């Protein structure tokens, strides 16, 4: 076990085996991935009776952890990739660690809120749920009003801009990149429906990500897709070049500066221990 202390980031390096599809583009991932709406976190925080400890599992670049740090005394932000953790933003009350979702060093019944953003479909669900039940705070008849800890998982689907641009996006996503998507991507495409979730279900309002982006910002995001990187590795060519001219024409004049509203639907599962 190696502990690396740097810029207030506590990185616990452990030998782990997992599908690492994003570490090679960790810096791009950190800068180009869409930001989740603050209203989503406000909703989740309103569900927990205590705000002592949150665990952001598979934190990636730490985006969700940063939001949680505004509400909780302490946040544990973990990921199986030390490259992702190395690009996370430090915060005084965030402790970044490297360990798999299914095997943690967290204490029993210690976590008030577990969040899993854009990652649950990668986990060994049986092992992860067992670990989540172990670390989630158990309900009691005291200060928590009989309510236990909360677990929330969400993913966002394919973005939408306009009918014309969306047609080009689907050409890239399905026809060009279709064979290069991992099998787990289908779980997101199915909106997490049918995925086991052995917790007391909590109904959630609808959330979506809305950002005003230039074409270059959107292209930067698309380059973080694992399927794009797999296509490049296998074919030694850039799949985005196949659709770029059509996409630029559909975007309109001054593609660098002109902003368009980009929307991603969010699919959520929220429950209580």
Residue ranges of predicted features:
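Class I SAM-dependent methyltransferase Rossmann-like catalytic core
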Residues: 22-34
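Conserved alpha-helix/loop element of class I SAM-dependent methyltransferases that forms part
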Residues: 34-52
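Class I SAM-dependent methyltransferase SAM/SAH-binding core
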Residues: 55, 61-103
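A short acidic, Gly/Pro-enriched loop at the edge of an enzyme's catalytic core
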Residues: 102-113
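A short SAM/SAH-binding and catalytic strip from SAM-dependent methyltransferases
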Residues: 112-126
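A short, conserved alpha-helix within the catalytic core of class I
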Residues: 123-135
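Conserved catalytic/acceptor-binding region of the Class I
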Residues: 133, 137-213
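Conserved Class I S-adenosyl-L-methionine
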Residues: 190-273
């Amino acid at each position: 076990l190696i502990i690396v202390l740097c810029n207030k980031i506590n990185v616990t390096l452990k030998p782990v085996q997992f599908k690492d599809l994003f570490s090679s583009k960790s810096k791009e991932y950190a800068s180009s991935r869409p930001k989740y709406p603050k209203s989503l976190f406000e909703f989740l925080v309103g569900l927990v009776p205590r705000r002592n400890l949150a665990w952001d599992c598979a934190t990636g670049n730490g985006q969700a952890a940063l939001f949680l740090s505004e509400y909780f005394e302490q946040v544990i932000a973990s990921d199986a990739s030390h490259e992702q953790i190395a690009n996370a933003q430090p915060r005084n009350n965030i402790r970044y660690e490297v360990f798999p979702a299914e095997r943690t060093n967290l204490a029993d019944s210690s976590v008030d809120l577990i969040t899993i953003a854009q990652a649950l479909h990668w986990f060994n669900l049986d092992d992860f749920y067992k670990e989540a039940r172990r670390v989630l705070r158990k309900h009691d008849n005291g200060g928590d009003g009989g309510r236990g800890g909360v677990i929330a998982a969400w993913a966002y689907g394919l973005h939408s801009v306009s009918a014309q641009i969306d047609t080009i996006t689907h050409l890239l996503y399905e026809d060009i990149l279709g064979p290069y998507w991992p099998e787990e991507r289908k779980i997101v495409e199915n909106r997490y429906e049918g995925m086991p979730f052995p917790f007391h279900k909590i109904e959630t309002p609808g959330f979506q990500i809305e950002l005003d982006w230039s074409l270059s910002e959107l292209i930067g995001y698309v380059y973080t897709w694992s399927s794009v990187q797999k296509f490049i590795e296998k074919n030694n060519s850039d799949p985005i070049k196949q659709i770029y001219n059509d996409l630029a024409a559909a975007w309109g004049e001054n593609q660098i500066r002109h902003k368009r509203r980009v929307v991603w639907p969010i699919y959520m599962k929220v429950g209580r221990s």
